[in-house]
């Protein structure tokens, strides 16, 4: 499997993020059911932003990860100030992937 770490950037006090928050976990829940979501959550330092970690097939590329995340309500409603996709190698793999 190829693992991707995705950074979501947004202001902590964004009214749009707050409004869309119920729809975002629903989207992530579908990824979890499909076995693609490893974990996700906001950073707790008060600056906003979040990390999402997903797994796709060995041949998957960043473009594949971007396509998978394209329907996230945070993205489709332009609530994010940025998204950064990385391939990631969990060397000390405590995630079971």
Predicted regions and their residues:
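Conserved, structured core segments of small domains
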Residues: 1-97
